[in-house]
Amino acid sequence: MSELLIPLDKYLAAGLHIGTQQKTKDMEKYIYRVRADGLHVLDVKSSNDKIIVAAKLLSKYEPDDILVVSTRQYGQSPVKKFGEVTGTKTIPGRFIPGTLTNPQYAKFIEPKILVVTDPRSDSQAVIEAKQNGIPVVALCDTENLLCNVDVVIPVNNKGRKAIALVYWLLARQILRERGILSSDEEFDLEPTDFELKI
């Protein structure tokens, strides 16, 4: 277990721990408690530790070999900003079937690892990655199934602020792992820079 990347209150303010009223057996181990209204609350320590694990893994790949996908509206701005900061390929918005499997498709790409904002809404990308043996890192909420997911980041993958915070933390950690930022150096961007503006 590692130290928190940011103070606990910042995680809580972004709603990173807020799950849904549904839960899957797969996600049970990441659930801290169930509120009286039936809402499942994620364990912030698990979220924090999995962000660190994912960043370490992603930092071992060339930026050009990483594809980050989000069909979910609140994930599109964070994914674009993450791509700008880390140099990774991104597909914010609709994922066209065949992007990873059809060499005849004009925008066909062959990443070595895939990151998705929600394995359910980004299921086409996950399926194509699995067909090609590409590992999948996924932001997963309490109701997600983990089949075809290799690295789980247990977080609220529906909230605008929560998704932005996760991609901000991932970007910062990857830059630290790559030695672009030192561990005590401040990141010159804020989580709000990753948020969808409404």
Swiss-Prot record:
InterPro entries documented for this protein: Ribosomal_uS2, Ribosomal_uS2_arc, Ribosomal_uS2_CS, Ribosomal_uS2_euk/arc, Ribosomal_uS2_flav_dom_sf
Q: Which family does it belong to?
A: Belongs to the universal ribosomal protein uS2 family.
Q: Does the keyword Ribonucleoprotein apply?
A: yes
* Any one Gene Ontology BP term: translation
Question: Keywords in UniProt for this one?
Answer: Ribonucleoprotein, Ribosomal protein
Q: Report the superkingdom from the record.
A: Archaea
Q: Does the keyword Ribonucleoprotein apply?
A: yes
What name appears for this protein in its UniProt entry?
A: Small ribosomal subunit protein uS2
Name one molecular function that GO assigns to this entry. Answer: structural constituent of ribosome
Organism, scientific name = Methanosphaera stadtmanae (strain ATCC 43021 / DSM 3091 / JCM 11832 / MCB-3)
An example of a Pfam family matching this protein is Ribosomal_S2
